[in-house]
Amino acid sequence: MSNIVVSPHNLSTKAGIEILRQGGNAIDAAIATNIVQGVVAPETCGIGGDLFALIWINGETKPFCLDSSGYAGSNVDISSLSSYSDIPLDHPMSVTVPGAVRGWYAMHE
C-alpha cells in the first residue's frame, strides 16, 4: 500500500487506513476519516458542519476544489436579509444548512 492517512485523531486515521486495506480508494478513506473525526472530536468537524476538499483525480492535469459549505434555508430570500447591516452570530439567520453530507456524496460520485 502506498497511501497515507492523516487526521487529528488516531481513531479517525485508523478508520481511513482500514478502508484502504479493504480495497477502498483515497476518497472512500477521506470520507470515513472525516465521519469518524466528527464522532471522536465533534468540535473539529462533523455531520452538522461544512466540507471543503482539494481533490486530484488520477489522469487529470490539475486538482479541483469542492466547496460544500452550507446554504441558506429554503425560506430565506434577499428581502428578508436586506434590513440587516450585520447579522449577529446568535441570530437564526446566521445559521446555514450543513453541507458535510452533501459533500461526502459529491466526493463519492
Summary of predicted features, one role per range:
Residues 1-22, 26-109:
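Noncatalytic scaffold domains of N-terminal-nucleophile
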